[in-house]
Curated annotation (Swiss-Prot):
SUPFAM superfamilies: SMAD/FHA domain. Residues 1176-1193, 1261-1280, 1312-1328, 1381-1398, 1606-1618 have a biased composition (Low complexity). Residues 421-434, 454-479, 1005-1023, 1129-1150, 1216-1227, 1564-1596 have a biased composition (Polar residues). PROSITE patterns: FHA_DOMAIN (PS50006). Plays a role in microtubule organization. Residues 147-156, 180-201, 436-453, 481-490, 758-773, 817-828, 1045-1056 have a biased composition (Basic and acidic residues). It comes from the Eukaryota. PANTHER family: CENTROSOMAL PROTEIN OF 170 KDA (PTHR15715), CENTROSOMAL PROTEIN OF 170 KDA PROTEIN B (PTHR15715:SF18). Keywords: Cytoplasm, Cytoskeleton, Microtubule. Residues 136-201, 329-369, 415-504, 566-586, 637-659, 719-739, 758-842, 1005-1084, 1100-1341, 1379-1405, 1443-1463, 1560-1628 are annotated as: Disordered. This is Centrosomal protein of 170 kDa protein B. It is found in: Cytoplasm, Cytoskeleton. Residues 23-73 form the FHA domain.
Length: 1628
């Protein structure tokens, strides 16, 4: 065609056609791009004035200007261009002349929207038609010209309206097909009128598609089109689109398009990727334009057009691309198929995760069920029918498949077509199904998107209804269409009314048109589709659908649902498909009923945040969710959790139901509970819980089975045993949904309000006796509570209940619970998980709904239930801690009854159930699970302790004492069975934020104390009783928090049984341990109950230091009084404190755990724990304080003063520290909230302050202040160790300390030595360090004041510690000889007394310490004994200096000032002793050897002066070869010795080389033997710490050799061999 156009002809002859629109001229991203750097990025614009038919140029304020006829034009002003005007932009070498040229343009190019707009050609007719059609479609272009211009502009405005190309493709993209179909002009007319058609035409033309096929003259131009956006094989793609088929079907499409232009535009615009979507028929897509075009019209066009085969390959490529980039395809994978996104580590849960569309495996509460429902319904009701329709009724197929004409294109290339369909999202079902690869891809993507949307739909009937509305209009945007389809089917199958209720912005537009055209097209293509795509599509559809839900059971149910839904939907789908047509070609999901979509999106968001309330999610999601998805009945489940779930459960999770519990019953139970708790349980959280829970299913199941055959239990068991999916949800440990305490809190509060603490205690005492007998019922109740499976607290509480029952019947409980523990390594967690799993409804923590209703109603233990109500309230606050702490709290509660009745174990378990967050923290919920974010362990502790506040003072004291004793025993047992305990009761409980790491490190003792409580519930409870009796005087809250931590520790160290009979001893020992191993735990306790630690610390101090029941009794009385005041005070301030404790403890436990972990890794935390464990080991069953019992009288010498001193030192939060009633009450009252803050804000300062106290003795009142500080310091293991030290020191029995606490002082000193090299001998320096630290902490006035109060105590403690240091030094040597590594451990931190238990106490830290000690000792040049000991201390010390951040920093971070002085002092003492013993003789020997060697060297030089051997050369050579860096050591003497020995070594090597350069001379065998003996014995002696004796026993020469060799070895790399040098030295 001849067309006249305006051109800019450059001086180089290049012609640039000026379109009838504004174009930019510049260097970047401009229509006219110039290369000159003098041209701005956007230099000028050339606009077209259609009225005057002239072009105007405007300079955009460019730097170098625009010149017209060599005259610079003003900026920002249009200048009219005339023919032959000379234009220059900037200083570009090219000048442009405006010319009007007549040129030939192929029709195809004319059809090209952009090209035609640029050219004035006979497209006006088409333009007019387009204009009309555009108007019909509400196009933004008013005139054909404007439309063309807009098209030229890539129809950016049209794109959104018409579903224009998704990726910036011009609006004409894909219009080739339309033009091709009705190329005569209708297509062109419609092209602009109906953007989709136009796009199709343009696409075809541009891509060489059907238009060219349609008009064979244009067939020549397929590639003639103006190179534009996508000159990709769109033509090819379109051409292979089964031209006959396409043409045939596209004719109706075009007709349909012509009838309802609005619908076609969407379709075509949808074909952003050269994919033509039939505007009329959503199910029709022409892949030729990248399969983007849906269009049945394309099909029709294809029918008209010659069927190009090339198109198929292009389509395939495009289809692949679409599959990869098509959200519908992503949507394709049903929840069942979501295997790709195992949202978690457990592949077992893949099916469970099927509903989870998040790759991390998480899923909103609504998400999972929604996905399941939409998937099921889509796949089950509609998709199967759609498949059938696709195979049988093109209309239905299109309707159901969202205009996936690609399937129909399957005639040419069914899989490819299906890919195109997958692109459409409608094709997802048939197309993806047919194409496994595409299907997988699509399903993955769809799984993500669709799950999100479907999840939202599943959230409520309304959401699915809205989605289903969009779903009938499958042609809607591919993403939304697919989702809509799924949702539609979901809603249509379960709620047929929803289908008609679908609201799509485009429903009115495309529904009818899409349906009608789809019917026509489908009928036309029925044969083709049936032949090529029917079987594959039907199969794939059903398969994919089935796969999504877990095609097993749901296939049949899907078929049924399909039939029902498809029947209902068929009519609706047609109507909706008309709407779908508007969405058919677009990914935009907006076309769906936006209102509903918005609602669904909001629902999804709510679900993500756990707000969504979906029984299906909570229960079915966890237990039957996947099956529900498969059945496609999830939506009904949403509406009728019990009814829909039952069928689904029965069909889908028959395995789960294998227990005999009807699926119906299971569903009902889960449904009811899930409704209550699921609101806050995110779907993803439930899923997360469920899949991790699958692993621990068997233990839980066994426990459940053993305990009860309850339906819920059966469900839980079945879910766990039968299917991971069901199990996963039930045990879901995802606590994020727990965050909202709204659901749980009310119930918890109800329980709390319903029952008073006193009544709880009493009822606990009574029911506790029954609990062991009623374990089954308890578990049943717990299982009932489990519906809040998400609520770990609920599970924990349940677990705790069982634990407490077992605590009464400890063997029974431990057997059941430990069995669970063995299964999941988290007995407490697992137990809690069992109820949680049983209650698949991860609604929230059972304590909320079930405790209030189920518990009270179901439990025979009404009193226990009552008790649990208040405790649960506390737990709710302490939610995170509840799981782990509940056992502790339970212990505390039980301990009270133990004292009274000898058994009290269940109240706290209820409390645990009560936590607002359902703490699914059970063994089932492994560390893999999300931590209980909602339920903070500290909060739990606070709640528990607060609930226990009402207990009698005596009970508190007893609990505290018992806890102290148990703490010591637990410390010992913990070290012994730390690994086993970790396995049995992994510290990974979600309650503790860092449970995983806790398990691995010695610091886990404190952290795991909460978690391990279940295992050691009895023991811990006993200790807790003792400890809490002391601490209860100060503050029940704190006591319970403290006992909770201790109980956790004891449970963690559950191997150590605590006998109430050993309470007195345990008091001392527990206190010692609270100062000792409990030190680290103290931090946790304090962290958990910030205010509590203070009192407990004082009690611990009193116990440790007093070690006398009399002191305890006296303190108990004051504490009892204090407790009364404190209890009332805490009852009022309890909430505030709990809140503070929550916020503070939330952060506190983590730092504590972190510091503990660090210390454990550095060997410090473990050392502290080891020290505590040592004490425990020393006096585990008996008065486990060997020295404590022996020296209890001594310790009681200065009960008040020592206690005061000890309290500040134990401020780190030793469990029994709060021994002074006044200090406890005032401190706890004062610092309950503040101390936590202090501990958080100034752990270091607090620690420093703790150390500082030795400076200034202060009255007990001041002591109270230090005590809070000690709570802050509680974090530091050093403070803990110091507490221990203080305990013994305050006892004024350094010998006692050595005996029972000796390890602790030793540890402290060792740690201090490791941390600092300051001479330990100077207690003044230590006091100065506390003073300086005190100054540092002066910033914190309270802490400082407290520290001042402590400083006096610390000063005395320092004096006592000096004695202890001496004892420690001697003991260290003894220990080194006996248990060499143990001392090094103690030196490394807590374990100077590791000789007995330090090594076993902290396995990890001990091992590392030992290893390091051994290495260091080997490297050390001191005599072996001293070397071993010093390396041990210096090992840790060097460990600290080189890695000071590691050990010292952690230690000091926790007890900064304090550890430094004690460490330095201890280290200085030991080093002084050892150095004096070893370094002096060694130094002397080294000097002598060096001098002798120098003389020998000079003589040798003279002797060999005239020889041919060059002494200097050899010496230089050897020196260079032997250049080994000298080990850095804090001891200058050692360094000098090493240097001297190295020099001697080199000189000897030189002499040896000179004398026997060739090496022919052989040293006498005797010498060799001697030398080797020396060499061998030296390392051995170093290793065994007997090197000193051996060295002494050996000849001076040997000693010299040894020293020389030792220095060489130490200076050289460990592997370096000095045998030659040694021999030489020996010879010399």
């Amino acid at each position: 065609m001849s067309v006249t156009s305006w051109f800019l002809v450059s001086s180089s002859g290049t012609r640039h056609r000026l379109p009838r629109e504004m174009i930019f001229v510049g260097r970047e991203d401009c229509e006219l791009m110039l290369q000159s750097r003098s041209v701005d990025k956007q230099h000028a614009v050339i606009n077209y004035d259609s009225d005057k038919d002239e072009h105007r140029v405007k300079d955009l304020g460019s730097l170098n200007g625009t010149f017209v006829n060599d005259v610079r034009i003003p900026d920002q002003k249009y200048i009219t261009l005339k023919l032959s005007d000379n234009i220059r932009f900037g200083y570009d070498i090219n000048t442009y002349v405006l010319e009007q040229i007549q040129h030939q343009v192929p029709e195809e190019a004319l059809k090209h929207e952009k090209y035609t707009s640029h050219l004035q050609m006979c497209l006006k007719t088409a333009a007019a038609g387009r204009e009309d059609q555009f108007k019909e479609h509400g196009a933004h272009v008013d005139s054909a010209q404007a439309k063309q211009d807009k098209a030229d502009k890539k129809a950016t405005s049209d794109i959104p309206a018409y579903r224009t190309p998704l990726y910036g493709q011009p609006s004409w993209w894909g219009e080739d097909d339309d033009n091709k179909l009705d190329k005569e002009g209708r297509r062109q007319d419609e092209h602009y009128s109906e953007r989709p058609n136009d796009m199709t035409q343009h696409e075809e033309e541009i891509n060489g598609n059907m238009s060219y096929r349609d008009s064979q003259d244009q067939c020549v131009y397929p590639f003639r089109r103006e190179p534009s956006y996508f000159e990709i094989p769109t033509k090819d793609f379109q051409q292979p689109v089964k031209p006959p088929e396409t043409q045939v079907y596209e004719i109706p499409t075009k007709d349909t398009d012509a009838v309802p232009p609005v619908t076609p535009p969407v379709m075509q615009s949808h074909a952003s990727f050269t994919i033509e979507f039939d505007d009329c028929q959503p199910g029709k897509i022409k892949i030729k334009d990248h399969v983007t075009k849906f269009s049945m019209r394309q099909r029709k066009t294809a029918g008209k057009e010659p069927a190009p085969t090339e198109m198929v390959s292009a389509e395939s490529k495009v289809a692949d691309w679409l599959v990869q980039n098509d959200p519908s395809l992503i949507r394709r994978p049903a929840p069942g198929e979501d295997v790709y996104s195992t949202k978690s580590d457990l592949p077992i849960h893949n099916r469970t995760l099927k509903g989870n569309r998040h790759e991390d495996g998480t899923q909103s509460d609504s998400e999972d069920p929604l996905v399941a429902q939409p998937e099921q319904e889509i796949g089950t009701p509609d998709h199967p029918q759609l498949q059938r329709q696709i195979k049988r009724e093109p209309e239905e197929l299109l309707h159901n498949q969202q205009a996936f004409v690609i399937q129909f294109f399957d005639d040419d290339d069914a899989p490819r077509k299906k890919r195109s369909q997958s692109f459409t999202h409608n094709a997802n079902s048939p197309q993806n199904d047919t194409d496994p690869v595409l299907k997988a891809k699509a399903e993955k993507r769809k799984g993500t998107l669709h799950v999100e949307k479907v999840s939202t739909n599943g959230m409520g009937s309304t959401a699915p209804a809205s989605k289903s509305l969009s779903s009938p209009s499958f042609p809607q945007r591919s993403n939304s269409f697919r989702r809509e389809k799924t949702e539609d089917r979901i809603s249509s199958a379960p709620t047929t009314a929803k289908l008609p209720g679908k609201n799509y912005g485009s429903v009115g537009k495309k529904s009818k048109l899409a349906q009608e055209f789809a019917a026509e097209y489908m009928r036309e293509q029925v044969e083709v589709v049936k032949q090529a795509a029917e079987k594959p599509m039907t199969l794939p559809l059903s398969t994919s659908i089935l796969q999504q839900p877990a095609s097993q059971v749901q296939i049949s149910s899907q078929a049924q649902t399909m039939q029902l839904t498809s029947d209902v939907r068929t009519g609706k789908v047609k109507n909706e498909e008309e709407d779908n047509l508007s969405d058919a070609g677009t990914y935009t999901i907006e076309t769906e009923t936006q209102d509903r979509e918005v609602e669904q999106a909001r629902k999804m968001i709510d679900q993500v945040f756990g707000v969504f309330e979906s029984d299906e999610y909570s229960k079915i999601a966890s237990t039957v969710y996947r099956p529900v998805i498969k059945l496609g009945e999830e939506e009904p489940l949403a509406s009728e959790p019990s009814v829909p779930h039952k069928p689904i459960m029965s069909s889908t999770p028959p395995v789960k139901l294998s227990n005999g519990l009807p699926a119906e019953t299971l569903i009902e139970r889960t449904g009811s509970s899930s409704k209550q708790s699921q609101k806050w349980v995110s779907r993803w959280a439930s899923l997360a819980d469920s899949y991790p829970d699958a692993s621990p299913t068997s233990p839980l199941d066994s426990q459940k089975q053993g305990l009860i055959a309850d339906d819920e239990d059966v469900i839980e068991r079945t879910e766990h045993q039968g299917e991971a999916d069901p199990t996963v949800p039930s045990r879901t440990r995802r606590l994020l949904p727990q965050l909202p305490p709204e659901n749980v809190m009310p119930t918890i509060f109800v329980c709390q309000e319903s029952f008073s603490d006193e009544s709880q205690r009493k009822s606990l005492e009574e029911p506790e006796k029954r609990i062991s007998e009623e374990n089954s019922s308890l578990l049943l109740v717990q299982e009932e509570l489990d519906p809040d499976s998400l609520s770990d607290t609920s599970k924990s509480d349940d677990g705790v209940i069982s634990v407490r029952k077992s605590a009464k019947a400890s063997n029974t409980y431990r057997n059941g619970w430990k069995g669970e523990e063995s299964h999941s390594r988290e007995p407490s967690v697992q137990r809690t998980s069992v109820p949680s799993n049983e209650k698949k409804s991860t609604c929230f923590y059972v304590g909320n709904d079930d405790v209030g209703s189920v518990k009270q109603t179901s439990f025979g233990l009404s009193s226990k239930d009552v008790i649990k109500g208040p405790e649960s309230h506390i737990k709710m606050k302490v939610n995170l801690h509840i799981t782990a702490e509940t056992p502790s709290s339970g212990k505390a509660v039980n301990q009270f009854p133990k004292k009274d009745n000898g058994s009290a174990k269940d109240p706290l378990s209820f409390v645990r159930q009560e936590s607002f967050t359902k703490e699914t923290s059970s063994s089932n919920v492994l560390p893999n699970k999300l931590p209980h974010i909602s339920t903070h362990p500290l909060l739990k502790d606070l709640s528990v302790t607060k609930s226990n506040h009402d207990y009698s003072k005596e009970t508190r004291l007893i609990l505290k004492e018992t806890e102290t004793a148990l703490a010591a025993l637990e410390a010992k047992l913990f070290t012994q069975s730390h690994l086993d305990e970790i396995e049995n009761t992994p510290c990974l409980r979600d309650d503790s934020l860092s449970g995983d790491s806790d398990v691995d490190t010695a610091s886990t003792v404190s952290l795991v104390s909460d978690k391990n409580v279940p295992s050691h519930s009895q023991k811990n409870r006993i200790v807790s009783l003792q400890k809490e009796k002391s601490s209860s005087t100060s503050s029940i809250q704190e006591q319970y928090c403290q006992p909770s931590a201790r109980e956790r520790l004891s449970e963690k160290r559950r191997t150590v049984p605590a006998d109430a009979g050993t309470r007195n001893v345990t008091k001392r020992l527990g206190m010692t341990r609270s100062t000792g191993a409990r030190g680290s735990l103290d931090f946790t306790d304090e962290e958990r109950c910030s205010s509590l630690p203070y009192m407990p610390v004082s009690e611990t101090v009193s116990s440790d230091y007093e070690h006398s029941s009399s002191r305890h009794i006296s303190r108990r009385k004051p504490f009892g009084q204090t407790c009364k005041d404190e209890s009332s005070r805490s009852s009022n301030a309890q909430k505030v404190q709990q809140a503070l404790t929550r916020s503070n403890s939330l952060s506190t436990p983590r730092p504590t755990r972190a510091s503990k972990l660090r210390r454990a890794r550095l060997g410090e935390s473990s050392d502290n724990e080891s020290a505590d464990v040592e004490r425990s080991n020393i006096s585990p069953g008996t008065s486990s304080a060997n020295s404590s019992s022996a020296k209890s009288s001594t310790e009681t010498k200065k009960p008040s003063r020592l206690d005061i001193l000890a309290m500040p030192r134990k401020r780190a939060g030793s469990f029994n520290v709060p021994s002074d009633s006044e200090t406890t009450s005032s401190v706890r009252g004062m610092f309950s909230g503040r101390s936590i803050d202090q501990s958080y804000t100034s752990r270091k300062p607090a620690v420093a302050e703790s150390k500082q106290p030795p400076k200034k003795p202060l009255p007990p009142t001041q002591k109270q202040t230090p005590r809070p500080r000690s709570s802050s310091v509680k974090y530091s293991s050093s403070s803990t160790s110091r507490r221990r030290q203080q305990g013994s020191d305050y006892v004024s029995t350094s010998e006692e300390e050595c005996g029972s606490n000796h390890s602790t002082p030793k540890h402290k000193h060792s740690r201090a030595s490791t941390a600092t090299q300051t001479s330990r001998s100077s207690s003044v320096s230590r006091r100065q360090m506390p003073n300086s630290r005190q100054d540092e902490e002066e910033d914190e006035q309270e802490v400082y004041n407290n520290f001042m109060a402590q400083s006096v105590e610390i000063a005395e403690i320092a004096r006592l510690s000096q004695t202890l240091v001496k004892d420690v030094a001697s003991l260290a040597r003894e220990i080194h000889d006996v248990a060499g590594d143990g001392d090094s451990q103690s030196s490394s931190g807590t374990g100077q007394s590791t000789s007995i238990s330090s090594v076993p106490n902290t396995p990890a830290s001990t091992i590392s310490a030992r290893e390091e000690i051994i290495k260091r000792s080997l490297q050390r040049t001191c005599s072996s004994q001293l070397v071993h000991h010093i390396p041990e201390a210096s090992l840790n010390y060097q460990k600290i200096p080189p890695g000071s951040t590691g050990l010292e920093d952690f230690d000091q971070n926790m007890n900064d000032s304090r550890e430094d002085p004690s460490k330095r002092r201890a280290r200085n003492i030991e080093e002084v002793i050892f150095d004096n013993l070893m370094l002096n003789p060694v130094s002397h020997l080294s000097h002598t050897i060096c001098a002798n060697t120098e003389v020998l060297t000079e003589k040798m030089k003279i002797l060999f002066q005239n020889t041919e051997k060059n002494w200097e050369e050899i010496e230089a050579k050897i020196n260079s070869e032997n250049e080994v860096p000298i080990l850095k050591t804090s001891n200058k003497e050692i360094s000098s010795i090493l240097k001297e020995l190295r020099r001697v070594q080199k000189q000897l090597e030189v002499i040896n080389a000179i004398i026997d350069r060739s090496g022919h001379l052989d040293v006498p065998s005797s010498n060799k033997k001697t030398s080797s003996t020396i060499l061998t014995s030296n390392p051995l002696s170093r290793t065994t710490n007997n090197s000193a004796a051996r060295t002494e026993s050996q000849t001076p020469g040997h000693v010299r050799n040894y020293m020389h060799k030792s220095s060489s070895s130490s200076s050289r790399s460990p592997g370096s061999s000095f045998s030659r040098d040694d021999e030489e030295t020996y010879i010399v």
